[in-house]
Amino acid sequence: MIFDTTNLENINSNNIQFDEATNLVNASLFYEHLERQIAQSRRDNSQFRIIRIILPDLMSELSLLDFASALNQSTRNEDVVSRIGRLEFVVLLRISQSTPDKSKDIIGRISDIYEGH
């Protein structure tokens, strides 16, 4: 009997990098992104912001998934949204010279999502 292990390797690789419940970047992959962003900032003098969000203990699993989805949808493709703890999320916002005000807009949207849950 012959097994195709390529699909299993892709599944295992994906599980290692993403949170199983929310499908957001997990803590270890977030810290890899953060290290790269710090190195890039040193090279080209770019900036970034980190937003840490801790949800209340009474948050249901469904509300948690809704929050994660809304959080992911409120950010840009170049930003990194991560679940690093049971009720803890972190967003890495990359700030460019051409669009510095975008980070403030994203922070406002994240605040609205947080207050809505």
Predicted regions and their residues:
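Catalytic core regions of nucleotide second-messenger enzymes
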Residues: 82-85, 113-117
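Regulatory sensory/coupling modules that transmit signals to nucleotide-handling catalytic cores
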Residues: 1-11, 108, 112
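Residue-level recognition of strand-loop junctions within catalytic nucleotide-signaling folds
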Residues: 56, 92-97
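Generic signature of intrinsically disordered, low-complexity segments enriched in small/polar residues
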Residues: 6, 33-34, 51, 92, ...
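Conserved long alpha-helical elements within nucleotide-processing catalytic cores of c-di-GMP signaling
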Residues: 16-75, 82-86, 100-104, 108
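A near-ubiquitous, low-amplitude feature marking generic local secondary-structure context
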Residues: 4-7, 13, 17-20, 72, ...
